[in-house]
Each structure stands twice: as C-alpha cells, then as structure tokens.
C-alpha cells in the first residue's frame, strides 16, 4: 500500500493535467512527496518536480509556436535531399543544421541519460508524418523559394520536439526516486514490458492530448488566426495527433530506455 501511495502521489504532482493558466496556481504537495527522494532535500525535491511540470508546459507552448511559424512556407523538397558537401558531410541541408541535436542534461540525472538518443525516429516522424500535413496547403511538393527559412524553421521544430521527448528522462528519474523499490526489481530483471507498464499513465496521456488541443485553440485566438484564410491555418487535428500518436509513445520509450540503465 505504501508503495502505491508513493507512486500515486508523484503521479498526481507530475501528471495532473494543467489548464493553460494553472502553472502559476499554488499546488497541493502531499507529505509523501517530500520524503520520496533519498538524495534530495525537501525543498529541492519540491522545486525539482514542480520545475519538471513547468518545463514540460513551456516545451508544449514552444512546439505549437514553432509549428505555426513553419506552416506558411512551402515544403522545399530539395532541402531534404541527401548530398555530399565540400567538407565531406553527407546529408541534407536540414540534417546539417540539426546534426548537433541538443539533448538537455543536468547533473541531477543519472549518467544513463547521456546515451539515450532517438533523434532518428523523431526525424522520420517529423519529415514523413508531420511536415506533409503541416504545409500541404502551402505548396507541398513545390518549393516557394525560401529554402533557408524553411530549413531553419524545420530545425527549430525538430529541436523543440526532441527536447520535449528527451526531457522525459527527468520524469523517469523522478518516478524512480519516488519509489525505487518498485522499479529496481524490474530494472534488475531488465523487464522492459514491466517497466513500460510502470511508466504508462493512459489517463494523463489522454488529458495531455486534449490539453494540447485547447492550447492550440488558445494560440489561434492569441494570434488572431480568425483573420487568416482557411488555407493559411494549421489542421486543428495535427497538434493533438502529434502528441497522441507520436510524442507520447516516444516519451515512454525514452523513459524505459533510461530506467533500464538506471542501476548501471
């Protein structure tokens, strides 16, 4: 029962869906959350877990903003064509811009986080699934001439999505510290399926997907999107789909990979 209470309390703190203005509201901290970490003091633990929630919310805002900036430009297919440059780099113009993908790390994380990189999957998802839907009404398959801007905005979109997904290592670390005796047997056994079951929070994922739809709608109002023509608007289902079908599953994958190495 105590184990379940520890897990539930952390879940309530990290995975309670926020309204767009709830980041600045006072949160109820349960006593069990304060004693959850073996290594962090009371104040540090509270600040850290609250910081994780706030950072994730800001990352979500950044993703929506970057997609909006990218959407008016054309696909510019040739910026994704792989070439060999004069300095020997083999890849597309966008790959060159993002080859030094930034994985956000801080000392509080276990060194296992440094070896986790699923950027190739993020690349395939963004270029193959998201971008065609994002720009399909703005010349998909037809270059609008502004290749540099298209490539630069693809870079910032990719970086924002990558940071959000890889930041889930912080969520995994917080979950582990809250209930190490729950996670350690599965980690020692290298039981990937059990760890996946531990990190899954279906209700929170569904709530997050719904919240992204609300954030997108609020963003439209903030940007006075009602003044734009229909062809200049992003498909309203794109952002929720991005989260529900791709970002949330990839964040789970990162958490599992991190936890499998947590005791190394």
Regions found by a protein language model. Give the residues of each.
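Context-dependent free N-terminus signature
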Residues: 2-8
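Extended amphipathic alpha-helical regions
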Residues: 11, 16-264
């Amino acid at each position: 029962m105590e184990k379940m209470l520890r897990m539930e309390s952390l879940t309530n703190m990290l995975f309670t869906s926020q309204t767009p203005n709830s980041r600045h509201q006072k949160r109820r901290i349960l006593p069990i959350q304060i004693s959850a970490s073996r290594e962090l003091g009371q104040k540090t633990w509270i600040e850290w877990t609250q910081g994780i929630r706030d950072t994730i919310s800001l990352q979500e805002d950044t993703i929506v903003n970057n997609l909006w900036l990218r959407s008016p430009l054309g696909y510019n297919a040739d910026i994704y064509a792989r070439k060999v440059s004069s300095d020997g780099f083999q890849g597309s113009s966008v790959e060159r811009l993002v080859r030094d993908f930034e994985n956000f790390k801080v000392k509080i994380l276990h060194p296992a986080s440094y070896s986790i990189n699923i950027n190739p999957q993020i690349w395939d998802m963004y270029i193959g699934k998201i971008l065609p839907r994002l720009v399909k009404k703005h010349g998909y398959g037809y270059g609008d001439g502004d290749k540099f801007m298209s490539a630069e905005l693809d870079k910032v979109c990719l970086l924002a999505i990558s940071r959000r997904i890889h930041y889930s290592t912080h969520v995994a670390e917080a979950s582990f510290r809250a209930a190490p005796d729950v996670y350690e047997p599965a980690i020692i056994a290298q039981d990937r399926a059990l760890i996946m079951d531990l990190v899954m929070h279906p209700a929170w994922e569904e709530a997050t997907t719904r919240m992204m739809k609300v954030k997108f709608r609020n963003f439209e109002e903030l940007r006075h999107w009602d003044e734009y023509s229909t062809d200049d608007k992003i498909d309203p289902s794109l952002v929720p789909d991005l989260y529900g079908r791709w970002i949330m599953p990839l964040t789970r994958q990162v958490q599992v990979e991190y936890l499998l190495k947590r005791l190394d």
